[in-house]
Amino acid sequence: MASPQEHSGPTTQPRGVPPVIAVVGPTGSGKSDLAVALALELDGEVINADAMQFYRGMDIGTAKITAEERRGVPHHLLDTLDVTEEASVSDFQWEARATIAEIHGRGKRAILAGGSGLYVRAALDVLEFPGTDPGIRRRLEEELDDAGLATLRRRLEAVDPVSAARLGDARRVVRALEVFELTGRAFSSFMPVREYYQPAVQIGLEVDRELLKDRLAQRVHGMVANGLQAEVQRLDAAGLRHGKTASRALGYSQFLKVLDGEWDTGQATEDTIVATRKFARRQLTWFRADPRIHWFDWQDPDLVAKALAVCR
């Protein structure tokens, strides 16, 4: 993904375009399948909003939708990064909004699908990402080393008391001061608001948590049986462990430990299951906080029809 250093993406759309659709929910809940079903009914195209599915070669461990599962529906923003590249939510915002505009320009419906909550909000909501300045950052980090966190926090309190009260660690205090020096605006002024940048509708998949726990365990075991360790080994040769984002992906970080001789396959599998379940709980907490989402039972036989009713 390539974009200007500082941007908030395209912020206007032609009048009369249909609402963007976003299918959200925890991992393993069936978002990809529902997005494809909606696309087939609405003449739509799907935009990936799962940060780990940006990576080429990370297929098994991310449950990336296969060509067969796409059922002829065009998919965008899959396989856009090498594992050594860092995923950027601001870059995604730019790419996603440009892709939405292109899809609408073809007279099609744009359908986001993914469980990376901040990425979904970046595409849908009024959300700005201030740029960075390595020189300012370096100077502030040197001041942190010389004068200490308390000194930088007092400076932040003078220009942005909201951030000073909210941010606890040194890295974030440095970032808040960097943003103020770079933009003249308080870092807190860039915080997201629940306001769509263009019309949108979000479809959430309501899950039975116990059933989801079982499904996630089965899915991880299936990934291992289908060659997850070999996939991690191939990607390690391509620099996986040096990628700040990709190396932290569920399953991949665990099986790197297998390659290093720290864990056996069983340990890596069980840790991946536990970590995936925790991740699903965090996703549910994130999406549940958004009152705009229309929730539907993931196992409802009329799921597609009910989702279509709020999308048309």
Curated annotation (Swiss-Prot):
The keyword Transferase applies. It comes from Arthrobacter sp. (strain FB24). Pfam families: IPPT. It catalyses: adenosine(37) in tRNA + dimethylallyl diphosphate = N(6)-dimethylallyladenosine(37) in tRNA + diphosphate. Substrate binds at residues 27-32. Monomer. NCBIfam families: miaA. Its EC number is 2.5.1.75. Its cofactor is Mg(2+). It comes from the Bacteria. This is tRNA dimethylallyltransferase. ATP binds at residues 25-32. PANTHER family: TRNA DIMETHYLALLYLTRANSFERASE (PTHR11088:SF60). Transmembrane segments: none annotated. Catalyzes the transfer of a dimethylallyl group onto the adenine at position 37 in tRNAs that read codons beginning with uridine, leading to the formation of N6-(dimethylallyl)adenosine (i(6)A).
